[in-house]
C-alpha cells in the first residue's frame, strides 16, 4: 500500500522535498512549495472528494539523479506524491 513505501528526496524547481513514488497516481501533487512561472487552477479527485490545486507546467524534477520535466500540481495533499506523469520519464515501471 501507499503508506508502506519509503519516502524519497526529490528536487523540484531547485527545492528538496520528501515524496512518495506512487505508480497508482496519474499526477504529481505536492503541498507547501513555491514554484516559478504561471499556474492555472485545476480540480483533481482523490480520497475524500475533489480538491482545488494550482497546475504548473514544464517543471524540472530530479529523482534519484534522473531528470524529468512535466506538470506539477500544488495543493492540499496528505503526502507529497510523485505520479506516473514523472515516473514514466525516468523509466520507472508501473507494476
Where are these regions (language model features)?
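Charged, flexible boundary elements
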Residues: 1-10
Amino acid at each position: 500500500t501507499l503508506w508502506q513505501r519509503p519516502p524519497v528526496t526529490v528536487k523540484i524547481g531547485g527545492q528538496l522535498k520528501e515524496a512518495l513514488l506512487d505508480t497508482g497516481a496519474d499526477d504529481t501533487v505536492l503541498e507547501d512549495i513555491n514554484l516559478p512561472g504561471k499556474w492555472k487552477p485545476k480540480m483533481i479527485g482523490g480520497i475524500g472528494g475533489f480538491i482545488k490545486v494550482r497546475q504548473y507546467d514544464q517543471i524540472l524534477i530530479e529523482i534519484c539523479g534522473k531528470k524529468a520535466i512535466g506538470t506539477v500540481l500544488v495543493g492540499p495533499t496528505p503526502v507529497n506524491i510523485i505520479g506516473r506523469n514523472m515516473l514514466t520519464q525516468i523509466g520507472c515501471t508501473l507494476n
